[in-house]
Amino acid sequence: MEHTITRDELSSLLASARPPLLLEALPAKYFEDSHLPGARNMPHDAVAELAPALAPDRAAAIVVYCANAACQNSHIAAVRLKQLGYTDVRVYAGGKQDWIAAGLPVEQGSAVTA
């Protein structure tokens, strides 16, 4: 089972001296529309292909998110990362919808995949 975190926990982690790698588990078109600041795009169905380039350090802190609490992409991606040997994987279950509802900033633009 994945470790889930709240918006406040994510905000604290992102403001820390060693912020986690933030990965959006949605397809590129949704990432381009909006994503959390500093996030990289790793669709849930491309984890095995993209993880080595996006997250070469398997011990690094990683937070995965997707659209909202009902979206399962982040949970699927987290399980796949764990299966690949990543040891510090968390899921921001509220996702983009929760972040935007709180009035927090998002970025737009093309998917950074490496």
PLM regions and their residue ranges:
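Rhodanese-like catalytic fold shared by cysteine-dependent sulfurtransferases
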Residues: 1-21, 25-64, 68-114
